[in-house]
Amino acid sequence: MPLADPHCHTLASDGMVTPAELVDAAVKAALDLIAITDHDTMAAAREVRERGEAAGLAVVMGQETTTAWPAQTHVLGWFLEKPIKRSMSVADTVAAIHDQGGLVIIPHPFMPTYFASIQPNMLRRLIDKEPVDGIEVLFTAPAGARRRRLLDSFVAENHERLGALIGSSDCHFGRHDIAQVVTDYEGDFRTAIMERRTTPRRGPGKLSVPIGMFWRQQRRALVDLPVKRLRGEI
């Protein structure tokens, strides 16, 4: 069964690897597919896809979009050809992704707000208006027992409107954190999402991030990326 890690970042946002390094890590991890989902930009997406094609790796172009304050939650869009504008409402972000023919995935839900995670009431209001195409139910962020129970309960109660169940590593460090969490799927990836033929599970990858690289990434995420947003660079 094909294996995907469908939530990956590069130096184009707050990741720590080039497109070439990301593709190399995915190939060495024996993945069949990745999704390139940099924050609020698709600057590296085409290069990742081209390098993936050359290496026999399927690449879904996408973006992890930051919605408007005060929520400032993250929404994943897959199968995109052009960037999604940041700082729109959650509903407008979802609509913009769907207008492109993209798929909407909810990443790392119900985590603390500093993860930019959607919260239960917000997600309920969203799916009351429009179902989403998938939701990450297995991820590397430390959910804790209480949040895990909350997510499991929410998914059980609302599964018809939440789409496919997804697992991903939210990879920022290439070979150091890719394929920790993966999605098994049948046949064509997009079709598998639409038909909910996916299985999230723990993958073969192991976390091995050097401490210096970790702190450099935190600076990129918490300082450099917000400054670029303020300057209008992304």
Label every model-predicted segment.
Residues 23-43, 102-105:
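Divalent metal-dependent hydrolysis catalytic cores, especially in the metallo-beta-lactamase
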Residues 36, 82-86:
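Catalytic cores of extracellular degradative/oxidative enzymes
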Residues 60:
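General small-molecule cofactor/ligand-binding pocket signal
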Residues 87-92:
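Ordered, amphipathic secondary-structure segments that act as subunit-interaction surfaces
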Residues 100-110, 161-164:
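Short beta-strand/loop segments at the ligand-binding rim of alpha/beta enzyme cores
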